[in-house]
Amino acid sequence: MSGLSASEAAQRLTRDGPNAQPQPDQRHWPRILASVLREPMLLLLIAASVLYLSVGEPRDAAALGLSVLLVVGLTLYQEVRAEHALQALRDLSSPWASAWRDGALQRVPATSLVVGDVVQVAEGDRVPADAKLLDSSDLHVDESLLTGESVPVARAPGADDAAARIHAGTLVVRGQAMAEVTATGSGTEMGRIGASLGALNREATPLQHEIRRLVLWFTAASIASCVLVFGLYLTLRGGWLDALLAGITLAMATIPEEFPVVLTVFLALGAWRMARLRVLVRRPPAIEALGSVTVLCTDKTGTLTENRMALTQLLTGGGMPHTPDQELDGDSLSLLRCAALASDANGFDPMDRAVHAVASASLPESTAADWEHLKHYPVTPALPAYATAWRRKHQPGLLLACKGAPEAVAALCGLADEDRSRVLADAASMAAEGLRVLAVADAHTTNADAPDSLENEAFTWRGLLGFADPLRAEVPAAVAEAHAAGVRVVLMTGDHIETARAIAIAAGISDHPEVTLGAALEQLDADALRALLARTDVFARVRPEHKLRLVQALRDAGEVVAMTGDGVNDAPALMAAHVGVAMGGRGTDVAREAASIVLLDDDFASVVRAIRMGRTIFANLQRATRYIVAVHVPIAGLALLPLLLGTPLILLPLHVVFLEMVIDPACSIVFEREPAEPDLMRRPPRPASTPLLDLRMIAASLLLGASAFALVLLVYMIASRAALAPPQTAALAFTALVVCNIALVQWHLAPSRSGIAGPTNVAFWITLVAVLALLACLTLLSAPAQWFGFIPVSLPAFFAAVAAPALSLAGAHWIIRRLRKVRVAGPVPTVPQDAGG
């Protein structure tokens, strides 16, 4: 099979477009702009601008008009940036397909398929495009996505037209096939009925619900205070214009429009940063759950190991071990030939490839050259072995070649107890060396047709194959980091008990692991299983239903579970876990769809990196929301001050816009880029019930904001006593307010560090320099000052207004840290290093 050439495929892709459905939820910038123009902050600015125009203040109206453009530009930048991150994730989450190109079977993005491509699909795959079958073996397809019928239907070439076709989006539940693509993208049956594939899930998350509650609470308080201030100002002071401006300013100062923006930006950019670590987030709740994971269940092959199988040992029925680099005797060659016939020469399975690599070098002729393939028998829970049926050309009878778990193949061969014990002891000895062990057997039959099942055939034991799959170099360090973070690592593998034990020791999961076989779990009730899980970290010969039961038992015990999987039957366990982790390289489409996270490199260390990133995102999101609560207190206080003191308005809508120019970048850029604290992965997992903001945090933020307002008030009172003009007093109070804003950013960035932000957060320093430069222009230069309703102040007064709040808050931060160190006896508690072992 040659398939299309790469150049022809590229030409057809240019002509027909990508194999993708439209994405109705994708937001381009005009749609984003329309949503920005409906923001409450913008509507208040427009209202204030119209108000200024109506009373003959065109300069103030123009200034607010310019500020409207600034707010629109900044908000549009944030939203477009988040949307670009989401689009990058959509591109990464696009499925892959196996297609013949330039005479070789290749893994290509499904979006690059074109009409005429020859694709190969197997159990667990989503069909990537509409196609006509060329060849198939026991193919059954779930077409419920198109027809609503849940019963899989058989498909085969040569049948009527409908039965010889497969359609995009349907699921292969059994067998395999080769097919020629006949339609792609919107031209498929799926496209014609208007379905959309590949879009990221945007369901509401617990954090989103919490943010909505905060927004509703603060909005209600904002509206109530705005109406109250307008009424009181009008009653006590008179002048509807000032009363209305005071109400609008207070509303702008207190409406919590930053909350939803911060959540959107953090989750989108957090998922994008994870993708750069080769971790694809398919569902937003996974980011929230990652920081709470207490148990990480992992398989072995390709996750803890490199999935780079090499056939290193052949052990025949005579008990003589051989290595492939030796000259093989007749029994070893027969073993190798049988293993090659039981392996897919064009597949992606690393053990199949390893067998064929040795067979092509060791066997005198092409193994399958004289054989016609008739049927294959996939692995099932009842028989963990793979077999194929072959007919030798020009000769009667059939050959059945089988390879699989030694126990299953031994039972298939009907070995006597003594022989069975011997071969299983050989398998255990090989497994104890860390080898992946498969048994090989064959059967000859005179029947003309391949049998429906293998159980009634007379199989002959041929021997054992030992595959070396080296442990990934970074796994021991990643396991140690997980243990230090209070995350227990549990190994669930289908491998031999001794292989599981050897890998667990090498990876550092446990020094002396107690290994339990999957079959033993079937004899345990819920209480016994819970007791077993409390002391066991390694499970061998585990089937998918065992994984599901283990995950459910861990959840029932109160653990937050992350689970890795790659097969069709792993989907229930992946969905049952709080965080399902599918393999992007070797995983099936079904597993990827069931999972909330996909590892693009199938690497265990990536899971631990994702846990670290999840903790970092939540910690930074918590910092940002606490800062939002704190920073609005001094702004609201300065907006209320004239009403309490009977002085002219200090804060105007334009001033609040300037403050928003500080608050929004601080939330969406500075906090989002704050690196993890050094001890983040030495702390226990965050309880899943931990809210983003609890009452204690809100009270602390309000108190911190009140302290900042007290400093602003102090500067204002000193300036008033210095007999400065009211616009100069307002300028100094505004300066102190902006500096307090920056100080609050720094305060919340790293509470465990000193009073000055760490040098790693470049975004903070850029924001600081830019804001202070603009602030100096607004308060020291005549023209900009007039636009803001100020009169320029002296340089010493400006420096005093900058230094007083900055030094006061930095000093308070330093004192609090000293008091904490005195109050805490000894170091901050960390998770014991042997946790999980």
Sequence positions of predicted segments:
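Actuator/coupling domain of P-type ATPases
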Residues: S2-G3, R15-P24, G73, R81-H84, ...
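Cytosolic catalytic regions of ATP/NTP-dependent phosphoryl-transfer enzymes
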Residues: H167-L171, A289-E418, R422-T460, F467, ...
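Hydrophobic alpha-helical transmembrane segments
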Residues: A63-S94, R101, E203-T298, L465, ...
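Cytosolic catalytic regions of P-type ion-transporting ATPases
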Residues: A63, S94-R212, S334-L336, Q523-L533, ...
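Membrane-embedded transport module
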Residues: V229, L267, L333, G347, ...
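Helix-interface capping motifs at the ends of transmembrane segments in multi-pass membrane proteins
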Residues: L43-A63, W217-I255, A268, W272-R278, ...
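Conserved beta-strand/loop elements of the cytosolic catalytic core of P-type E1-E2 ATPases, chiefly
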Residues: V68, L74, A104, T182-G185, ...
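Transmembrane helix-loop-helix hairpins at the membrane interface
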Residues: P18-A99, A104-Q106, V151, W217, ...
